[in-house]
């Protein structure tokens, strides 16, 4: 029976007079790939941050890997993120003074865990960069740097991988390679992926697409294609505020 890797129940997040999320209830089943889309300012990144424990909701509850986040101290929340969550962002956020393999090993070192070289090499092998293990970021292309960031996110074997516009800084061909890696990890490894994107082609790699408008869920698509996603987005962008 499939369980939920992440669950949000009636989550609201306000910043002063602005309501970024408004009574959002969503589940992200384990082993699935979900894309989150919506017009600019719809609450996509806020949803990801609340779901990942990077931001606390004003009201409502978030459960991550079976743990309710609301009652956790900042220290316990940080430990949970280190051990159970992976992150990939538009900016690669690699440390320039470290090699690819050292960047990948960093989450294990921060968590005080033993760094097995074979495990680091396996993570780089997964993303097709084993031969670049000793290269620093300055010697890697943008696509290669994002693949290192992906290997780093997966080194702790997280329950869920959150990706915020992971192809936003990449050219079309390189972006498709990264999306193919994400799709493959879901299919082969049962990895759970939640991805924020503005690109209908990127969203079509997912099992389903959840749409937000003005901080509220505004429907979803399963088995999406780029055309069906683009058509839905066109309609949503015409919704009056």
Where are the regions a protein language model picked out?
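ABC ATPase NBD coupling module
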Residues: 69-86, 227-231
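Conserved ABC ATPase signature
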Residues: 136-146
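Catalytic Walker B motif of ABC-type/P-loop ATPase nucleotide-binding domains
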Residues: 161-164
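The feature captures the beta-strand-to-loop junction immediately N-terminal to the Walker
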Residues: 37-39
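Conserved catalytic motifs of ABC-family nucleotide-binding domains
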Residues: 157
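Short coil-to-helix segment of the ABC ATPase nucleotide-binding domain corresponding to the Q-loop/switch region
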Residues: 98-106
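Conserved ABC transporter NBD signature motif
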Residues: 60-68
